[in-house]
Regions:
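Generic transmembrane alpha-helix signature in multi-pass membrane proteins
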Residues: 22-30, 94-100, 111-112, 119-138
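Hydrophobic core segments of alpha-helical transmembrane domains in multi-pass membrane transport
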Residues: 23-27, 45-51, 83-92, 117-124, ...
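C-terminal ends of transmembrane helices
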Residues: 23-37, 90-104, 166-177
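Ordered, amphipathic secondary-structure segments that act as subunit-interaction surfaces
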Residues: 61-108
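Structural signature of hydrophobic alpha-helical transmembrane segments
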Residues: 6-20, 72-86, 149-162
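Juxtamembrane transmembrane-helix termini in multi-pass membrane transport proteins
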Residues: 6-47
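Interfacial loop-to-transmembrane junctions
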Residues: 171-189
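Cytoplasmic-side transmembrane-helix entry/capping segments in multi-pass membrane proteins
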Residues: 37-47, 77-82, 104-115, 181-187
Length: 207
């Protein structure tokens, strides 16, 4: 249980997908103009992560690994199978959002189906694949399906916090004076840089 919470906290603050690895930046910058829309996308990304990572973990350890049920090393297929799982889950999320929240579906536009190619989702699966091979004494080690869920949930929450935080700041900046050369993406990149520097203070935590 201690390792479960350690993975959760580390993936939110220390190994944040946005501020530590710069993954998922396209939708992060494009959909962070409104807090409500950013929150909706953040929840969708978190849901996709929490569902896809355990499925991909089971695929990697029980099917693709040399000691899996097939007895053949099929790890070379992991990339394409991970993408297939992610695409299927994103399609499910898109159908659910369109059914229960048409306004959110309309505001997210093309960025909802693009979750399927959000590098934060694929990156989390590849990091998970890498962490399976680490020593059990390593704080980043993923040894069972619960560890994969913890890592997925933390990665999703970290991404959600990052996009909602930026959206809140950008909403305030809309009513603030910004020099003409910095308007738009200029001031946004500066803001993201300052937020990343703030998250760097967690990098020394030994969790």
């Amino acid at each position: 249980m201690e390792h479960f919470f350690s993975l959760l906290v580390r993936s939110i603050f220390v190994d944040n997908m946005i501020f530590a690895f710069f993954l998922g930046m396209c939708s992060y910058l494009a959909v962070s103009k409104n807090v409500k829309t950013a929150l909706g996308l953040g929840i969708a990304v978190t849901f996709v992560l929490v569902v896809t990572l355990p499925v991909n973990y089971l695929l990697q350890t029980k099917v693709l690994a040399a000691d899996g049920i097939l007895g053949i090393d099929l790890s070379f297929l992991s990339f394409i199978l991970f993408i297939a799982v992610i695409a299927a889950i994103v399609q499910l999320v898109e159908m659910i959002v369109e059914r229960f929240s048409p306004s959110l579906y309309a505001s997210l536009g093309i960025f909802l189906p693009l979750i399927a190619v959000n590098c934060a989702i694929m990156g989390a699966s590849l990091f998970m694949q890498q962490r399976i091979t680490l020593s059990p004494s390593d704080a980043k080690y993923i040894g069972d399906i619960w560890d994969s869920i913890s890592y997925a949930l933390g990665s999703g929450i970290g991404w959600l916090l990052a996009i909602v935080g930026l959206a809140a700041i950008r909403e305030k900046m809309a009513y603030s004076y910004v020099p003409a050369p910095l308007k738009g993406l200029g001031i946004t990149f500066i803001t993201v840089g300052l937020m990343a520097m703030a998250f760097m203070c967690f990098s020394g935590l030994n969790i």
